Amino acid sequence: MKVIKRDGHMVDWCPEKIEIAIEKANKEVQEEEQASSIQIKNIIKYIEGLGKKRILVEDIQDIIEMKLMSIGKYNLAKKYITYRYTRELVRRSNTTDLAIKELIDGENEYWNTENSNKNAKVVTTQRDYLAGITSTDITRRFLLPEDIVTAHDQGVIHFHDADYFAQNALHNCDLINLDDMLQNGTNINGVMIEKPHRFLTAMTIATQLITAVSSSQYGGCTITLTHLAPFVRSSKEFYLKKYKDRKLTKAQVEKFAAEELKKEIPDGVQTFQYQINSMTTTNGQAPFLSVCMYLGETEEYKDELAMIIEEVLKQRIEGMKNEKGVYITPAFPKLLYVLEEENINPKGKYYYLTELAARCTAKRMVPDYISEKVMKENKINSLGNGECFPCMGCRSFLTPDRMFNVGNISKALNYVENKGKYYGRFNQGVVTINLPDVALTSGKLIVTTP
C-alpha cells in the first residue's frame, strides 16, 4: 500500500509511524484512558484490511480518530487531534519562522556572526536581518533556479546577498557621484539640497548624501576627496572677502584667511569622520564607505585636494575615541591612496603625503594602495585609453567604460563627453565560484612542469 502525502508524492505504508503517533498521545492522558498495544495494532490491521493500493494521509488520520472514539478513548482521541493539529502547524511553518524566532531570541548563530560590522542585538540591525530572512526565503523558493540553489548549498558556488535579492530595485556596491550632487544640488526625502558655499558645509552634506545612498543599496560605496576639493577654495575665497571687507592690508587678509582655512579643514574632516561613524543606515550599520585620495583626478584643485588628504591621514593616525575614551582605529571610512608619479618620487611635490600615508599604514593598517600605472595598463576603455579609478567599498572594481557610444544615459549634469564614466555606476549580482571544487570534481589530472 502507498500513502499519498500532502505535497502529492507517494511513500510506502509504514505502520510504525501510527504506533509512534498514538504512543505520543498516550503519554498525555491517564493510564486508564490510554490505548493498549493490542488496540493500536487492531487499528493498524483495520487500515491494512481496507485493501487499498493508495490512501491519503488525511484519511489515515481520520480513521485513527474514529477508531479511538469507537473504543471509548475520547480523551486520547482529543490528544491525537491536538497532536495532528500541532504537526500540521509545524509542516506549514517554514525555515523562515524558525530563523525569525531564533534571531529575535538571539539564538541564531548565523545572523549573530554574519557581518562583523553589525551587532545583531541592536534593534536597527535586527530589523534589517528580519527583512533579510524573508528575502532569502523568497529568493530561494521563487526567484532562483533550482540548480543555482543546489549549487549554493553544495558549496560549488556562493550566491551573495540573497537577503536583499528579492527587492530588485536595490543594487550592490557603487561609486557615489558626489560632484554632481554637490555642484548641481539634489534632494533628500523631498528636501532640496542646494550647492554648499563652504568646505565645512560640503563635508556635512556629503555625509548625509552618503547615508542616503547607503540606505538605498546593500553594498559598499566609495567617494573621492577630489569632489570636495573645490569647496576648500570656496572657503578660502569667503575668508579673503571677509577680511578684505574689513579694509585690512593684503598681507593681513592673506594671513587671517589662511589661519581660518587652517582651522576649517580639520573641523570639516573631523565632522565627516564622526558623522560617518555615528550614523546608521537602513542596513543597520554605519555606511560601508571608502574614501579615495587620488591627486591625478584634478589639476585645477590639486593643491586643495592635497590639503584634505593631509588632514584625513593625520586624523586617521590619531584615531577616534571609543566609549571608554581610548583612541582606536575606526572601521570606516576605509582609505584608498593612489600612487602616481607626483607622490612616489622623493623629489616629487606631494611625496610628503606618501610618507604620511606610510606612517598611517604602520599604525592603523590603512590606507590601501592603488597603483595608477598598473591600473591604466589593465583598465582599458573602449576608446583604447587606460583609466584609474577606485574600488567600490572594499574590493570590487567596475569594468572599464565601454558605453561611450550611448552618451549621457544617466543624465548626470557633470557628464563629460569621451571621458570614462565611473562615479554614479554600480555593480549587481555577485557570485563566487569555488575553483578548487571545480578542479577536484572535474575528474581530470592536470600535470604542470616546472
Where are these regions (language model features)?
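Charged, amphipathic alpha-helical regulatory modules used
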Residues: 1-106
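Conserved catalytic cores of very large enzyme subunits
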Residues: 89-90, 96-450
